[in-house]
Amino acid sequence: MIRGSEGKLLAVVALGATLSGCGGDWQNWFETEKVTPAVLTQPDSASQLTDYISRATSAGKRVRMTGNGHAMSDIAITNEVLFTPDKLNQPLNLDRSRLKNPSDPGLVRVESGIKIADLNTYLDAHGRALFNMGGYDGQTLAGIMSTATHGSGLGFGPVTDSVASLQMVVDGGKMVQIEPSNGITNPATFNGRLEENSGIAVQLIQDDDAFNAARVGIGSLGVIYSVTLNTDQKFWLREVRHEIKWSELKKPGGYLDRVIHGLPVYGDGQPSPEHWELQYTPYADANGDHTFLITDRYHSYTPLPEQPSSERGQPGTDFASGLVALLGQPLAGILDTFPELAKPVLETTLNAEIDDNYTNVSYKVFNIGVVNDTPALAVETAFTLDQVSAAIERCFTISDAAMSQGIPQTGPIAIRFVKQSSALIAMQNGHNTAFMEIIELRAGKNAKKLLGMHQTAYRQEFNARPHWGLDLNSLTSEAQARALYPDTWDRWKTQYRRFNVSGTFDGKVTDRLGISVRPR
């Protein structure tokens, strides 16, 4: 007898069937997107993925796979068949007999739904590490891949640039293994079968455009089953945080100028941090200047002291961050009522993070900690490096204009630097990139309005690219997307149509962009 969600799935995707009310609600972490799909289920194997997707294609149903809900946009959702990744979260065997270089120690294979926190724990136990990551580790690997999520440091691309190979279930329930043209797999020793289940055929595709489309596919080419990653050996980070004024930071030959031009940040003979980022308040001080916090992170392959998070920043910072996470809603209400208080709040927040030395294993330094639990909204925008100073100063004017309307900026603004990527619609495609992330307390009555003001200005004035996940669904036509990716959009779309022949992986995002194979 077929029971539970599997039975519901078979019912809803049976050819010609109609069924409602058997799924349940799904909502993202930001509470900006909520759907009641006809089916909401957790595939637990490649066999289930291929079977469910085959049936969905036959019935003309749409399928999407969520991550952990940390995309603010509609990228992950559908009203039809929605998968969640909770049961596809394990490390997998890598059959090294299939590889061109079987002895490569850096290759690791995992299921796509593994959370970054669990991936880090697994890698650490095996003496390995991610080269770089963002400040939050609760996301799934497939989620951060598909949206080109990143850390900071111009020596490192987005996390998806560490992908060596991926296995994906595409239209009709077919499993494909996609790699670059010079991929890691030896076609002569590849047996065309899935490692975990020899009953599942796998087509090896070694093609640059297919690979560069699939690894940032915004969930629209198929459902990723497994990922093989290139990893680094385990390393530690020393973090230093210090304040500087904008007038000093931006001057010709100053720190920002040196970073943009690939020069040693602190001058010849001084060590340069591998990871460099900024936080700032958009509000001027009494002298008309702005406070910035620089975060330097230096690599060490020699073990460093592994300090507890309570020793990071000024005394009490960890406790204060936890308090903000707990009291986000009342704090937002206070700042809505007394918006001018946002100015000292932001200055105090930056001051609290100053630290002349914090060390730990890499992934514990990359993770910004309890502040991730703060109920917030966020948008992120990608600029070319030569735009970053002008973009920051435009941010000042937008924030001042909003404050004049009683709309405060309720969190520090971050600037991160990321190496260019060959993924076709990664925000980093074609050039090194500076990202601006703007965070607002979720309960602020005008939070979305302020974020929208920023997004609109940056796209219209800079032709800047919105992050695929941290976005208020700001792109509403294919023409807008093509203008942002003039050299690569049509190449990506060709692969989208190649693997999504029947429209199985259409979704709200493809409807919004006007590219769905079968529009609803």
Residue ranges and their predicted role:
Residues 277-449:
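C-terminal substrate-recognition/cap domain of FAD-linked oxidoreductases
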Residues 32-113, 117-135, 148-153:
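Glycine-rich N-terminal segment of FAD-binding domains in flavoprotein oxidoreductases
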Residues 144-259:
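FAD-binding subdomain of flavoenzyme oxidoreductases
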Residues 266-279, 403-414, 462-472:
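Flexible, glycine/charged-enriched surface loops at secondary-structure junctions
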